[in-house]
Amino acid sequence: MNVRVLGCHGSGQLVPGTNGPIQCGTCGFLVNDRLLVDAGTIGSRLFLEEQRRIQVVLLTHLHFDHIRELPTLADNLVGEIDEPVVIAAIPEVLDGLRAHIFNGTVYPDFFRLPDSARPVFVPYELREGREDLLCGMGVTPIRVNHVVPTVGFLLLEGAHTVRYSGD
């Protein structure tokens, strides 16, 4: 299992580094080039070619540092992909995305665009404690204590395991 850290900070800010400023990226982890865990940092760290390879996005919760670049991903992928990207999350997160982000006011509804037969995103409802097979990995959401409905993830691939708390 190959995990690439795209960002792991609560905000996008510059911090001093030994060789100059470092741009912190919000939460995003790319697993095996195809599965993204949280969507805080995508386009600011991945070339379009890399974004096209993403098949599944797992979301832990709705806080902005975990979904910030999801609309940008959708915009970048319109007309660029043959299959929609699966947005996998617990029901509260999927409902919140539709109500507050992809509502036609803040951002277009990429669950229906560019057309309902070929949307950029398709929702996939995760259930706490149930393992699903996504991108060849076992994915189990585990409820964690946070101020909004939130899950962490247990990812299993062969003999490899990653646990991600979300916050």
Region spans (language model):
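DG-centered beta-turn motif at the end of beta-strands
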Residues: 165-167
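Binuclear metal-dependent hydrolase catalytic cores
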Residues: 1-163
